[in-house]
Amino acid sequence: MQGVPGFNTVPNPNHYDKSIVLDIKPLRSLKPVFPNGNQGPPFVGCPPFGPSSSEYSSFFPFGAQQPTHDTPDLNQTQNTPIPSFVPPLRSYRTPTKTNGPSSSSGTKRGVGRPKGTTSVKKKEKKTVANEPNLDVQVVKKFSSDFDSGISAAEREDGNAYLVSSVLMRFDAVRRRLSQVEFTKSATSKAAGTLMSNGVRTNMKKRVGTVPGIEVGDIFFSRIEMCLVGLHMQTMAGIDYIISKAGSDEESLATSIVSSGRYEGEAQDPESLIYSGQGGNADKNRQASDQKLERGNLALENSLRKGNGVRVVRGEEDAASKTGKIYIYDGLYSISESWVEKGKSGCNTFKYKLVRQPGQPPAFGFWKSVQKWKEGLTTRPGLILPDLTSGAESKPVSLVNDVDEDKGPAYFTYTSSLKYSETFKLTQPVIGCSCSGSCSPGNHNCSCIRKNDGDLPYLNGVILVSRRPVIYECGPTCPCHASCKNRVIQTGLKSRLEVFKTRNRGWGLRSWDSLRAGSFICEYAGEVKDNGNLRGNQEEDAYVFDTSRVFNSFKWNYEPELVDEDPSTEVPEEFNLPSPLLISAKKFGNVARFMNHSCSPNVFWQPVIREGNGESVIHIAFFAMRHIPPMAELTYDYGISPTSEARDESLLHGQRTCLCGSEQCRGSFG
């Protein structure tokens, strides 16, 4: 019909209406079809082989909880109760027992919906939230029946589980958009998508701490902080609320982000000199005096009231040329304010903030690690600067500041697997024919086709999605060693440290911040026959066993949030031809020091690559969520299934668990 915009109507660029969303099917939603012959066939056993002896080097050993502070309750609204279901896990969901009735209303729970949310809500029109300075793209309206799994009350007041879930779902969508669109706008587009679909929490502005966010948590964009309520401004450095006292209204500062790029901002971990907002010169205006309004006025009022202000410190991201990492450094008190002339000659407001006592170190830890890396100070308790003796691409420190132990028991360090039995494809392995590097979207690459048409990594280090198995390029592939599909075979990407724990032996942590999906290491050792290790408790302490029962969790993106057919969702269950058993007692790498946790921050992923005409399985570890420096790296060891306990809920491990998590199941192994 004339005058009615249809599917083939070309809009007038001078009269563009953003309320009209074109129904255009993107190319990334079309799944390519490849011949069955290019798909990887099943595996069978084949004769053993192992790495050369040059890969090994011998290693010889040489002869609290944050208190709660009472703060004035200055929050604007208090009538929304915090949900009673507050799982403490910040990494992934596990099955929980509920006393209430199970949902039987027939309402479909959306993918990634937090368990425990069974309320049925009326369908409501979803729009992008009206956030100040929010730079998000116009996104396509999704189906009105999409269920975010987050109730209205949970959007106002969150908890640790909801914060973890929102951040995990956001980053999963961001990774997928980056994988298929190859643009830098994936972050803002992912944020707009989640906001328009109600995937967020802690929307109620508040003074003081934010439920579910801990001191030391790190973020890789301001939008992440906005989604979980830590700092609602995506551009402005000062966030505030309007507090009502009778008929009077008064603004109070809730949080600030210190980017470290303004003159006078101190780098002291216990105090901060913060510059006010406004008055900056740009292409449309000259510099001017700052005014006592908006955020500046809110900081002045908070100085007078004495309320705590959340402080987020921004630091350069070493892995990105332009990116930043934001560290939540806890609550600060404003001690004084003044006005001084800036470099432009205009008046600038200055505020001194002092960190409140009794909080765990966050930014202070960050600055200490920077000094260790630069060689300005020596790591306390350092035993060896590199226990790998050069076997890894990066040194791995050995540290003990707990007792007099000088090192772990003797073992030979190796950076890869030693196979006594290998897995072989029933058909010959076919490598790619790429020159230089395998490119995203190149469907002529056989290695990419094995990964269902996608390059599994971003920037050669970040895993996009968990898969039944991932295929990497092998020796017969002509692509060079820096190919983005050669990740686990190129060694460590982060500076790691083996350290002595207080009650669990030796552990592993990183000096670098780890973004969700970051490759950490593979599990190196000797591949063993199941029958030779069963019952050997001493050797079992250094065994990785794929046949164990592991807690399930959701990590991948939700297809509905990236405009993909739900039937194309990538399965997260691993698909191995037979159980893989690796012993790291005699031969191993840093992975042998990773402790178990029932609430881990690391997960494992099978990776296959060709070697000498055979397809060999490797076990790679990736960050489950953003991990700050000096946080212990842990994964789920699983529980060995027994004939007496077929029901997973009745499984009991061989060793007592000391992870200390509130979700601790009591045993593992």
Swiss-Prot record:
Its main location: nucleus. Transmembrane segments: none annotated. It comes from the Eukaryota. It is found in: Nucleus; Chromosome, Centromere. S-adenosyl-L-methionine binds at R504, G505, W506, D540, Y542, R592, N595, H596. SMART domains: PreSET (SM00468), SET (SM00317), SRA (SM00466). One of its GO terms (molecular function) is histone methyltransferase activity. Gene3D superfamilies: SET domain, SRA-YDG. Expressed in leaves stems and flowers. It catalyses: L-lysyl(9)-[histone H3] + S-adenosyl-L-methionine = N(6)-methyl-L-lysyl(9)-[histone H3] + S-adenosyl-L-homocysteine + H(+). Although the SET domain contains the active site of enzymatic activity, both pre-SET and post-SET domains are required for methyltransferase activity. Belongs to the class V-like SAM-binding methyltransferase superfamily. Histone-lysine methyltransferase family. Suvar3-9 subfamily. Histone methyltransferase. Methylates 'Lys-9' of histone H3. H3 'Lys-9' methylation represents a specific tag for epigenetic transcriptional repression. This is Histone-lysine N-methyltransferase, H3 lysine-9 specific SUVH3. The gene is SUVH3.
